[in-house]
Structures are given as structure tokens and as C-alpha cells.
Amino acid sequence: MSDAYLALETGDVVEATARAPGMARGELVFTTAYTGYEESLTDPSYEAQVLTFAYPLIGNYGVRPERTESDRVHPSAVVARELTDDVADWLRTEGVPAVDGIDTRDLVLDIRDGGAMQVGIAAGPDASPATARAQLADCPRLSARTEIGAHVSVDTAETHGNGDTTVALVDCGAKRSIIDAFVARGATVHRLPYDATPADIAAVDPDLLFISNGPGDPANFDAAEHLVDEYIGTVPIAGICLGQQIVARALGGDTEKMDFGHRGVNQPVLDHDSGRVVMTTQNHGYTVADPGDLTVTQVNVNDGTPEALDSAPLDVLTRQYHPEANPGPHDTRGFFDDVLAMADASYTPATAD
């Protein structure tokens, strides 16, 4: 083990222990999830971010490839109070810097009180406060990463499943479990690149246009926004997380960056129609500020931000949280049944996962 340093945007430099060497920079964020570290670390929505785990011990049930949400680790670096050797070895193999041995409660409070901030990390034998500060100096804002979609999307189209309902899934950084949720309910999913064209959508003749989750600023996903504008009123449209934000922007709404976002597996959401509160998995740093032509049907109990946007006349259903969970509670997996029913009135929902 060797030295590591975190240079914060506040001007502070925090000393830590290097568990996987390297230099990194990104937006410093935290998750309050106490399980599901395999899924979180492979969630494309964490691209270009430095992920801090609020829970003090990460790795106490090993690393299982079958639990991953993509083919690689996506955070630029990982920060924890304590990482097990299994997780540290995995991150080292992936080439992702990792540090521990610090009180992450202090970092979480800094982010909560001051908002998400940029950070530079230096870990390993050549690390110093100066090298960490150099990483910070070169760190672009998340909104400036205009090509982030290219780093998390498929390059060419893929097909999953062989069901009766056809879903055109625009991959802006999709989690594997979202695709699995559709396939388990009898759908054929055409996974298309983030910059898919209207012609690409037309080629698969979908019953449903789905905009996936993903990282970064929704304003940087013009191609997906154009698809919504092109197909609204013609094909039912759904989206999750970043997808909700993109759909709202396409339909006259707007988005904004949050102070520190929602990242965890216990975010309470209130449904206006039923009065029911459900626990949800969330991972986002932007939110819908103006829903445009859509109606807000669910809100976050903690801060009132929109968690669901619907329009029966336009055949639109979106969710800011992750109904597929992985990790997290399964309270809202019925969303996939709802959107498939919207796409095909004759569709019979499969048994819930």
C-alpha cells in the first residue's frame, strides 16, 4: 500500500491509502447504497465521476461477474472508508484508481453542503499533492463532456430476445438489467447507438421507443432528443433516468443540475394518484425543472423533484428512478409491464420478477 491524495475543488487535499494505482479526475459524488457495489461500479451512469461510497465497508461478499451491469467499471476512480482485497484487485485489473483509509463521512458532508465538486486523484508510488492538484486543474465540468454518450453506448445495433413486442432502445448508457427486464416480459429489444437516426428507428419498426439511462448532461444528447420529437404521437415513448430528462426536453421542458443529486437505494417517491410512497433506486445529478407537455405524477419525498412524467394522449411514460433496481428494491418493476401494455394493448404482462 502506498500514498494517495485527493485534491478537492475547495482547495483541500486529503491524504488516503492507495488500493489501485493511477491518476484520475472527475466529478466527486457519493452513493448511500450499502449493497450492490458490483452493479454500481459497472453502471454507465457513473462515467466520468469519482464514486464515493458512504457505507464504510465495500466488498464483503466478493465480486461476482454475473452481477455486473456492463462490460467494465465506469467511475473514473473509487473512494471508500475500506475496500476489501477482492474489490481492490478488481479495480486494479480494470485500471481504475481506488483509495481508502479516509473518513468518507467528511467527504459526504462536503458534497452535501457544497454540492458536487471536481476532484483530482493521485494514487501510487508517484503520488503527491501536486500531482493530485494537476489532475484537478485539468478536470472538465460534466456538462462540458459533450461526447460522453460515445463512451458508454454500443457502436452498432444489437438484438436481444425474440418476443412479440418490439422495443427500440436508444442506448445512452443502458444498464444490462433494463434490457433483461424487457426480454423477461416477452419483448424483442433492438439496442441502438446513442446517436441513432430516425431511419435507424424506422428500420426496426418498433412498438415502443425507449430512451435509456446514462451519464452527464441531458443537453448533450441532441440525437436522442430529436428522435423523441420525430416519433412523438406516432410511437409510444418511455424512458428511465437520463431518458426522462431527454423526453422532457424534447417536449418543451427543461432540465437543471442538482446540488448533489440522488444516488442510493432508499429514495422515497410519492405517487400523486394513489398516495402511496415507494422506495426506489436512483443515480442522477440532473433533474427535470419544467415538464413541458407532460404531467408530473410522482415526486421525490425529500425534495419534491419530478420522479415520473406521463401523458396518456401522447403515449408517454417516464421515470427518473430505476424501476429495474439492481441494486435496490423491486417496488416499481411494474413500470415495464405498464410501458409494454402502452405499446401493445393486447400485451399480457409476464409474472413480475
UniProtKB/Swiss-Prot annotation:
Keywords: Amino-acid biosynthesis, Arginine biosynthesis, ATP-binding, Glutamine amidotransferase, Ligase, Nucleotide-binding, Pyrimidine biosynthesis. Gene3D superfamilies: 3.40.50.880, Carbamoyl-phosphate synthase small subunit, N-terminal domain. GO terms for biological process: 'de novo' pyrimidine nucleobase biosynthetic process; 'de novo' UMP biosynthetic process; glutamine metabolic process; L-arginine biosynthetic process. SMART domains: CPSase_sm_chain (SM01097). GO terms for molecular function: ATP binding; carbamoyl-phosphate synthase (glutamine-hydrolyzing) activity; glutaminase activity. Disulfide bonds: none annotated. InterPro entries: Anth_synth/Amidotransfase (IPR050472), CarbamoylP_synth_ssu (IPR006274), CarbamoylP_synth_ssu_N (IPR002474), CarbP_synth_ssu_N_sf (IPR036480), Class_I_gatase-like (IPR029062), CPSase_GATase1 (IPR035686), GATASE (IPR017926). Pathway: Amino-acid biosynthesis; L-arginine biosynthesis; carbamoyl phosphate from bicarbonate: step 1/1; Pyrimidine metabolism; UMP biosynthesis via de novo pathway; (S)-dihydroorotate from bicarbonate: step 1/3. It catalyses: hydrogencarbonate + L-glutamine + 2 ATP + H2O = carbamoyl phosphate + L-glutamate + 2 ADP + phosphate + 2 H(+). SUPFAM superfamilies: Carbamoyl phosphate synthetase, small subunit N-terminal domain (SSF52021), Class I glutamine amidotransferase-like (SSF52317). It holds the Pfam family GATase. Residues 1-166 are annotated as: CPSase. GO terms for cellular component: carbamoyl-phosphate synthase complex; cytoplasm. The active site is at C241 (nucleophile), H322, E324. It is an enzyme of class 6 (ligase). Residues 166-349 form the Glutamine amidotransferase type-1 domain. The keyword Oxidoreductase does not apply. Its EC number is 6.3.5.5. PANTHER family: CARBAMOYL-PHOSPHATE SYNTHASE SMALL CHAIN (PTHR43418:SF7), MULTIFUNCTIONAL TRYPTOPHAN BIOSYNTHESIS PROTEIN-RELATED (PTHR43418). Small subunit of the glutamine-dependent carbamoyl phosphate synthetase (CPSase). CPSase catalyzes the formation of carbamoyl phosphate from the ammonia moiety of glutamine, carbonate, and phosphate donated by ATP, constituting the first step of 2 biosynthetic pathways, one leading to arginine and/or urea and the other to pyrimidine nucleotides. The small subunit (glutamine amidotransferase) binds and cleaves glutamine to supply the large subunit with the substrate ammonia. Composed of two chains; the small (or glutamine) chain promotes the hydrolysis of glutamine to ammonia, which is used by the large (or ammonia) chain to synthesize carbamoyl phosphate. Tetramer of heterodimers (alpha,beta)4. Belongs to the CarA family. This is Carbamoyl phosphate synthase small chain. It comes from Halobacterium salinarum (strain ATCC 700922 / JCM 11081 / NRC-1).
